[in-house]
């Protein structure tokens, strides 16, 4: 959970912190001895959650080289290390740091560690801001480095990442609460929940299918393994002719008044295009999710709504007001809009929680009594206990800071709530609480919610509309299940074109086996919700099952029906 001591533990491994008592041995060296500081830091590479905390250069190449330069790597070797590290994370040496997305910056931080060639790599929530494909690339890279003999220590709240681990440690309130293999820990879901953790979606699927008799074991730790097991136990249910259903458009979407409209919006910095002819609308009272890879322009798009960024050309309307017009009342616009940035701790500034939350209401011309009332109600609404009211910000966990920032926005009673990656870095309990808060604000208070998220399973939980952005363009817009399904078809089409292969129906198969190659399929579906990933695999293998389901119960029922259990 947030605040359990994981990041503190990570800093001890790198000798950024020392314990008050006890012994810490790193590679056989006593971390308490002053002469071991440099040798330990050469051995242990550290990647933090927020890349801005460890980036110092203005150009990618310069930043990646910094660490290796400081341990006196010869120039010729340094150049090769930087080239290799950048190739591993897929970045160009000449890119400027300030032009990168949060995910792009995190790749720079990882490359900087790789260039130092450490024996141990500690990633402290380092994948939390990455899009699904970038996260998959980083985790695959870590597995490759592990095969080369490098020890990987991954601190994470993303339960799906635990599926890759050989050994898992659970921390709670500064203590080691559980440890063991994934099989051992995932067989104790109730105990995990005591510590604020939930089973990964993949494991939930395996357990639910085992309970319904679709598979005879619940120890399955990937959607690939689940699909293969279902095929092995129910081969008769799979058709020889394997086809995919055509995508459809959800025609039942409710028609509401358009609240936010983008008309042919473009944004360029010099020759670099950020947004390209963006046309979309967000309905009044709706819950809209914006998804897409890092660097697609999602955060930029969000910041245009309250006129924090102006487009190069095109028009943006909010409640009929053209915010791109020089005569627009921007102050009135911003009173309607609550905005939570990607790193919410950066918008907290007061001496304690209460003072931060009450600051906004105090500055909009209402009475002190009303301002205090709004602040206390907002703090209570986001589920923060009374004993945090007077706490300074540095005493709060990341999840608590996220809720303080949200409380400050809620206290302003906005019509629109815009959040950039509100779930990133939250533990399962914090994520669940955040989703409950957003759900209540949307359904009960009627607030229009717009979120940027990389969490597909969370998106399908509540969003009524999804916008998919890539390379500054909106490629898909519609109901979540339709958008994710069309993304799968689009991705397969793109991969087929790139690999100069032929499509058989809507599939790309390995010529020798007639099956999609595992790497191709895994890359194509990694942006999709976990349930849809499994259904697509089964459909490709020949099971006559719809690929449109995104919820656990309906997915399991569809598979049960298809295999005839």
Question: Where do the model's predicted regions map?
Answer:
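Conserved ABC ATPase "signature" region
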Residues: 76-93, 369-387
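Helix-to-loop junction immediately C-terminal to a conserved catalytic motif
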Residues: 14, 306
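Conserved ABC ATPase signature
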Residues: 96-104, 392-396
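Catalytic Walker B motif of ABC-type/P-loop ATPase nucleotide-binding domains
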Residues: 121-124, 417-420
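ABC ATPase NBD Q-loop/coupling interface
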Residues: 23-39, 315-332
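A short, surface-exposed alpha-helical micro-motif characterized by mixed small hydrophobic
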Residues: 161-163, 459-461
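Conserved catalytic motifs of ABC-family nucleotide-binding domains
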Residues: 117, 413
């Amino acid at each position: 959970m947030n605040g359990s001591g994981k990041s503190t533990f990570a800093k001890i491994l790198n000798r950024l912190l020392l314990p008050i008592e006890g012994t810490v041995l790193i590679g056989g060296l006593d971390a308490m001895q002053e002469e071991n500081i440099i040798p330990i830091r050469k051995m242990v590479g550290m990647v933090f959650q927020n890349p801005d905390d460890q980036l110092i250069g203005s150009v990618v190449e310069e930043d990646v080289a910094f660490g290796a330069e400081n341990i006196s790597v010869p120039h010729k070797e340094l150049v090769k290390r930087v080239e290799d590290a950048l190739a591993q994370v897929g970045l160009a040496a000449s890119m400027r740091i300030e032009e990168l997305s949060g995910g792009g910056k995190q790749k720079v931080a990882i490359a900087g560690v790789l260039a130092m060639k450490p024996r141990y790599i500690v990633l402290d929530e380092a994948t939390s801001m990455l899009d699904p494909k970038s996260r998959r690339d980083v985790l695959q890279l870590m597995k490759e480095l592990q095969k080369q003999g490098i020890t990987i220590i991954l601190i994470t709240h993303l339960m799906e990442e635990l599926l890759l681990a050989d050994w898992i440690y659970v921390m709670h309130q500064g203590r080691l609460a559980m440890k063991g293999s994934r099989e051992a820990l995932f067989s104790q879901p109730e105990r995990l929940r005591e510590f604020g953790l939930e089973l990964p979606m993949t494991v939930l699927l395996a357990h639910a299918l085992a309970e319904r008799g679709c598979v005879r074991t619940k120890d399955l730790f990937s959607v690939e393994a689940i699909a293969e097991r279902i095929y092995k136990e129910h081969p008769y249910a799979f058709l020889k002719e394997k086809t995919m259903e055509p995508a459809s458009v959800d025609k039942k979407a409710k028609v509401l008044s358009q609240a936010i409209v983008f008309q042919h919006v473009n944004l360029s910095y010099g020759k670099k295009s950020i947004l390209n002819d963006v046309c979309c609308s967000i309905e009044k009272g709706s819950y809209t999710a914006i998804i897409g890879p890092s660097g697609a322009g999602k955060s930029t798009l969000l910041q245009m709504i309250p006129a924090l960024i102006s487009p190069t050309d095109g028009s943006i309307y909010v409640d009929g007001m053209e915010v791109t017009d020089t005569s627009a009342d921007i102050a009135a616009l911003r009173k309607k809009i609550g905005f939570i940035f990607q790193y919410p701790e950066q918008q907290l500034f007061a001496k304690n929680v209460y003072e931060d939350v009450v600051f906004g209401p105090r500055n909009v011309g209402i009475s002190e009594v009303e301002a205090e009332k709004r602040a206390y109600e907002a703090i209570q609404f986001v589920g923060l206990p009374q004993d945090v009211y007077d706490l300074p910000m540095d005493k709060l966990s990341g999840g608590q800071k996220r809720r303080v920032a949200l409380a400050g926005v809620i206290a302003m009673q906005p019509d629109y709530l815009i959040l950039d990656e509100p779930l990133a870095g939250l533990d399962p309990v914090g994520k669940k609480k955040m989703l409950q808060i957003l759900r209540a604000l949307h359904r009960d208070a009627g607030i229009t919610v717009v979120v940027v998220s990389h969490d597909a399973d969370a998106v399908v939980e509540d969003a009524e509309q999804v916008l998919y952005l890539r390379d500054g363009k909106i490629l898909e817009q519609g109901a979540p299940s339709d958008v994710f399904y069309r993304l799968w078809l689009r991705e397969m089409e793109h991969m087929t074109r790139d690999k100069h292969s032929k499509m058989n129906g809507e599939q790309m198969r390995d010529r020798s086996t007639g099956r999609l190659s595992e790497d191709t399929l895994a890359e194509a579906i990694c942006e999709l919700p976990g349930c849809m990933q499994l259904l697509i695999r089964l459909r490709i293998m020949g099971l006559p099952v719809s690929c449109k389901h995104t919820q656990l119960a309906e997915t399991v029922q569809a598979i049960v029906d298809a295999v005839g259990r």
